[in-house]
Amino acid sequence: MVPVIALVGRPNVGKSTLFNRLTRTRDAIVGDLSGLTRDRQYGEAKWQGRTYILIDTGGISGDEHGMDEKMAEQSLLAIEEADVVLFLVDAKAGFTAADQMIGEHLRKRNKTSYVIANKVDNIDPDMARAEFAPLGMGDAIPIAGAHGRGITQMLEIALSEFPKDDADEPEEGEEEIVAEGEEAKRIPGPSEKDGIKIAIIGRPNVGKSTLVNRMLGEDRVIVYDQPGTTRDSIYIPFERNDEKYTLIDTAGVRKRGKIHEEVEKFSVVKTLQAIKDANVVIFVMDAREGVVDHDLNLLGFALEAGRALVIALNKWDGMQPSERDYVKTELQRRLFFVDFADIHFISALHGTGVGNLYQSVQNSFKSAVTRWPTSRLTQILEDAVGEHAPPMVNNRRIKLRYAHLGGANPPLIVIHGNQVEKVPKSYVRYLENTYRRVLKLVGTPIRIEFKGGENPYEGNKNTLTDRQVNKKRRLMSHHKKADKKRRDKR
């Protein structure tokens, strides 16, 4: 399971600055889910082969009534979700009563916590450690979050208990948290035991629980239910038509066969982890509410992760034709960025259209993991360039030479050529659409990566042999004599 780190502390101690620095290699997945997470911000970061989820919380002022109320509700939830808590204090402001109360609460929670003394610019680190020793939480780790100093030591300590990602290596530039770009995550195909992993995600009360129970209907073959911790999703292996699947349910534990929908506790951490572990994501929306901003934020999670996607509009039954037409228009207008995904109009309660989801899951997964030979991908590239050549840059044509497969789920196509760093975004979209059309990809995003061709002889002088030098001398002498004769005739 991906470790979760929460940043807590008083207002203006530098939590957001540290959050932005740590997530710079992969920008914050979502800024604020208003109404769902309020003051919590979630991002994904990576450090020396370890991927982790980072939570930035609102400040805790310490002037509320009673300790449980003094801790802001969202910060409390973040602490409960986290594996590790980084308790930020302001080294310039010094030790405060609010720091004392927050520290006491963390000690009571028996949560792995570290005191981070931020803003130690021009402050003796030993003095900062001594200043916050009364917290009784061990030596404070001094950092300067705005400048990146001390972050290496902080992350080494915070992540020391967690294993590295499978087959991952540290990324270049991580030591100073300044590397840019991102590495698309690759996941293996379905195991013989688990089958295709399907994550059911969506806002609270859109029908996720009902859909899960409908998909695990009378013809199900449940192998086992494996509940996790309070923040873990439920993994439910089952079979349908001799095909194996594993449902990743973020809605929580429920009684077998319970169909009615209850108010669900929404957890961004559950959603992020479910998406990360899934092969295919079924995104559930409430057709009667249409497309809302929270839907777009959650779809951004799946798109960022590159997972195969199927969209299910639930509660379609009972809607008037005019209402249905309006919803379809809204889908085309607001979900254009996921136009590759199949959309199903269903009623999880009555089962209408639910069975059709499986075919889309199969098709999406097949598109996401199919492998094509280099010759096939290169031919598609050549045809695309022949039909619509790349633009000129500084009077030189961008040259795209060949393509090969770089990864799966999502498909990553690596294109080699010259001046590839100058390929405009519009042409990248043209290539994406071409590959999607020719390869008949459905339900999966596609990513294109460019690699420039290096000239192995660049900077090298051509060294002539003795024979070439003599030949060059004779030719020069011949040209000089010919020029002299022409001048004499004039």
Swiss-Prot record:
GO molecular function: GTP binding; ribosome binding
Keywords: GTP-binding, Nucleotide-binding, Repeat, Ribosome biogenesis
Chain intervals for the UniProt region annotation (Disordered): 164-191, 452-490
Bias-annotated ranges (Acidic residues): 166-181
Amino acids binding GTP 1: 9-16, 56-60, 118-121
Record has Methyltransferase as a keyword: no
Every KH-like domain range: 370-454
Biased composition (Basic residues): 470-490
GO biological process: ribosome biogenesis
Pfam families, sorted: KH_dom-like, MMR_HSR1
Keyword Protein biosynthesis appears in the UniProt entry: no
Residues reported in the UniProt entry to bind GTP 2: 202-209, 249-253, 314-317
Subunit composition and interactions: Associates with the 50S ribosomal subunit.
Free-text function comment from the UniProt entry: GTPase that plays an essential role in the late steps of ribosome biogenesis.
Family: Belongs to the TRAFAC class TrmE-Era-EngA-EngB-Septin-like GTPase superfamily. EngA (Der) GTPase family.
Database matches in NCBIfam families: GTPase_EngA, small_GTP
PANTHER family associated with the record: GTPASE DER
Name this polypeptide is given: GTPase Der
Annotated source species: Pseudomonas fluorescens (strain ATCC BAA-477 / NRRL B-23932 / Pf-5)
